């Protein structure tokens, strides 16, 4: 201190990063989707890299990931975060496909869908960390990605097999995220397409179709508002447009 005396401060949390995940969700009023925080830890003998991960799905729509290397907050992420994302995408995708849940949903699943509503803490201990990025807060050690991926995947696979109800809840959330993303894209494409058509000088009374494939689309020309209304009601919106 200012007087030259040595003092120490000890910070201790009995629950560790599991309690950390619970705290950040509680402080943000995020409702847990599953009752348990999924936790894993491990030491890779070859690289001497230690991994700790705690993750929890909630009812929200955002991804909240906090990553650390040797207790340094890596705000730009890095290979440890990449390994985490690769693991949850691969493991949950494999489980959903094996259970046939994605086939029933008839929607394309992307990596972001698996991370919607997830809160996670990733903490690794690396003997010789290599930091990158503008502020040197991005981990660059390539070997860490595989260590995190392998360590987390082993625990996730066992968790899903042992907790089928939680697994189903998570996969259903993933599917809902994919469906919402696809619906938003369709709505955005329709608005942009109509803007282009109207801006190009086409009549405002064009009832466009949803298909973008001109070879599979049909355009019906009708005279009068009455006939136009009848045609719109009887058409197939997927590939039939009415003018």
Give the predicted meaning of each segment.
Residues 1-243:
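GHKL-family ATPase ATP-binding module
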